[in-house]
Design a protein with these regions (language model features):
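Short, solvent-exposed loop/turn segments at secondary-structure junctions
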Residues: 1-3, 75-77, 92, 111-113, ...
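Non-heme Fe(II)-dependent double-stranded beta-helix
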Residues: 1-96
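Non-heme Fe(II)/2-oxoglutarate
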Residues: 23-24, 173-260
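Active-site region of the double-stranded beta-helix
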Residues: 65, 91, 96-97, 106-117, ...
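Short, conserved beta-strand element in jelly-roll/cupin
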Residues: 88, 95-113, 161-164, 169, ...
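Short, surface-exposed loop/helix-turn segments at secondary-structure junctions
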Residues: 89, 144-154, 185-186, 204-211
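A generic structural micro-feature
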Residues: 96-100, 151, 182-186
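Double-stranded beta-helix
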Residues: 113-179
């Protein structure tokens, strides 16, 4: 994607998330209202990002023509921040089967080894689902500090540097993480969780997802609406409903609370 497009999205991100946070300040019991989760339900820029043809073409090569967005997370690591993400597998906390979820990580600012870009351990997806443990630490960007329990050869990690507008794809079972941001600029990117329509949530809660290509042949999820304007009443209601379902599902499947 052109760098100028990424710059436009970044400016819109800063404008709209600031407006949302001002309108809906964090309150006890409203943890699920964060604009950092599923912003594509609230903002036009994010709705455009998750439907970008270049990203969808690459995802389709991996999962087929019927594609849903299951979740997104805004990963904002401030300059000089000690925040980091430990080695983990996404499949541990998404509550999906089969393990065919693919994450597209779209950079809106330079994502480099210095700024704490995503680093993967190639081939680890072949090991299947590994056990994880909680390591509470305020610097960890996952809410419970989820870390793979197995011994990891960090020296084998391969960083994935991205310039604004570039994206990477990683498998739901590949071990990955990211280091603190030692650069002078914020590292900002959107992690988009794409799944083939045949995937389903393994818990009892009926969740929602967004159809971005093909058909919803299996009806495993209620389909989410596309926002017609930033933070209009329908968009805010759809976002609250979707995140509320996810929150309720996480109460029944505690591992899902790591996504919040």
């Amino acid at each position: 994607m052109p760098a100028v497009q990424a710059e436009h999205w970044r400016r819109e991100l800063e404008r709209t998330t600031g407006a949302f946070d001002a309108a809906f300040p964090k309150q006890p019991g409203r943890r699920y209202a964060s604009s950092r989760m599923k912003p594509y339900l609230l903002f036009r820029w994010a709705a455009e990002m998750v439907r970008n043809p270049a990203v969808l073409d690459a995802v389709e090569d991996l999962v087929g023509p019927d594609i849903l967005v299951y979740h997104t997370t805004l990963w904002w690591k401030p300059a000089g921040s000690e925040a980091f993400v430990p080695w983990h597998q996404d499949g541990t906390y998404f509550g999906l089967a089969p393990h065919e979820h693919v994450t597209a990580w779209v950079a809106l600012t330079p994502s480099t080894p210095e700024s704490g870009c995503v680093t993967i351990l190639p081939g680890t997806q072949r090991q299947g689902q590994l056990p994880h443990v909680d390591k509470p630490d305020p610097a960890i960007m996952l809410s419970r500090g989820q870390t793979v329990a197995a011994e990891v050869d960090a020296a084998a990690g391969v960083p994935i540097p991205l310039q604004p507008g570039e994206f990477s794809l990683h498998d739901t079972l590949v071990l990955h993480g990211s280091a603190p941001n030692r650069s002078a600029h914020d590292r900002i990117g959107l992690g988009i969780s794409y799944i083939p329509a045949r995937c389903y949530h393994t818990g009892p809660t009926r969740l929602s997802a967004t159809l971005v290509r093909g058909e919803n042949r299996y009806d495993h999820f209620d389909l989410e609406p596309e926002p017609q304007a930033d933070m209009d009443a329908a968009a805010v209601a759809a976002h609250l409903d979707s995140i509320g379902r996810f929150w309720r599902a996480s109460e029944l499947m505690p591992e899902m609370s790591l996504v919040h």
